[in-house]
A protein has these predicted regions:
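Active-site-proximal specificity loops/subdomain of glycosyltransferases
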Residues: 3-6, 10, 41-95
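Short, well-formed alpha-helical segments that are part of the catalytic scaffolds
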Residues: 12-29
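A short acidic, amphipathic alpha-helical/loop segment
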Residues: 21-22, 47, 109, 113
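Catalytic-site signature of metal-activated, phosphate-bearing donor transferases
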Residues: 71-78, 82-85, 103-322
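The conserved acidic donor/metal-binding loop of glycosyltransferases
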Residues: 97-101
């Protein structure tokens, strides 16, 4: 079995992503690692090119994203992942984002499970445990799904994209999504239907326990924490650092992610305090000091927050430690 890892990068230096550690972890258990750059202008692409000169397992390419396109979100995410995937020459593919890491202790477990799935041709897509850090003080979120799709068979019909039932078109024929996808679903290119996948556990049971833990049930919270620790011991686990530096994440949301989601879902949202889920003021009035103060408070008073609604400081969200 040959295992290909793949990922995408864009201005990772300026955005302070742990991209080098992420790619190094892929190199630790993959036979090749394919990386597509979206047109970085902060030195990321140049550093990747230098790295490529000394690392024989790296396969790199650049596809410059047009950030003025109305569908730049889909172009820079789902489609860009597909471009990276199509560089893969292995039997199996492992996709990872550049704010995710597999630790060295999990390399052998990862290879063993990949080989097991490779020898079961009925499985085309497999999920793996995920822990998402909230701040730098050891909190792990319980308000997000504890898994991600990561291992797939290198079937050339499989791409990343918007499932057909959630795909819409603008008047200029560019594509956007309805709520329910981030454009990175594993779908079949010809039918735009979702690729069936295998879960690593009884996720209905775990999500029910997680819901009770989120609601404040201490017994459920203890069970969920012990289950998470057990999964980490048994299976390779994705460690997600998206919210590890909350201040950085909020700054990125101000400059990029708020526009990204408008592009993804074809929304036009005015910059008002009512539409800002993080602050009671428009983004144009938010200062770096505002961001620093909010990040400190979120890290110390909350265990996570999904910013589909304004922060409710009276509803203290739960977290676990591992």
């Amino acid at each position: 079995m040959k295992l290909s890892g793949y990922t995408t990068v864009y201005n990772c230096i300026n955005n302070e992503y742990p991209w080098e550690d992420s790619i190094k972890s892929l190199l630790g258990f993959c036979d090749e690692v394919c990386v597509v750059d979206g047109g970085s202008d902060d030195g990321t692409w140049e550093k990747l090119q230098e790295w490529n000169k000394t690392e024989s397992k790296l396969v790199i390419d650049q596809y410059i994203v047009d950030w003025n396109r109305p569908d730049f979100a889909y172009e820079s995410d789902g489609r860009q992942k597909t471009r990276s995937r199509k560089l893969c020459s292995g039997d199996m593919c492992w996709q990872m984002d550049v704010d995710e890491i597999i630790v060295q202790e999990d390399y052998e477990k990862t290879r063993n499970i990949c080989l097991e799935i490779y020898n079961n041709p009925q499985i085309e897509l497999m999920t793996f445990p995920l822990i998402e850090y909230w701040g730098s003080n050891g909190k792990v979120r319980i308000d997000v799904n504890p898994w991600k799709w990561r291992l797939s068979r290198n079937n050339p019909k499989i791409i990343h994209g918007i499932p057909g039932d959630l795909l819409k078109y603008r008047e200029d024929n560019t594509e956007y999504a309805l709520q329910g996808t981030d454009s990175c679903d594993y779908i079949y290119e010809d039918t735009k239907t979702r690729v069936p996948f295998v879960l690593f556990c009884d996720m209905n049971k775990i999500n029910n326990i997680r819901a009770h833990a989120n609601a404040g049930n201490q017994q459920a919270l203890d069970f969920y924490e012990n289950w998470t620790k057990s999964m980490i011991n048994q299976m390779p686990t994705i460690r997600h650092y998206s919210w590890h530096n909350i201040e950085r994440k909020i700054k990125n949301y101000k400059t990029h992610w708020s526009k990204f989601w408008c592009s993804m879902y074809n929304k036009s949202i005015d910059d008002t305090k009512e539409n800002n889920m993080m602050f009671d003021k428009p983004w144009s009035e938010v200062t770096d000091n505002d961001i620093k103060e909010l990040a400190f408070r979120l890290e110390n008073e909350m265990g996570g927050w999904i910013f589909h609604q304004k922060i409710d400081w009276d509803r203290k969200t739960k977290s676990i430690t591992i």
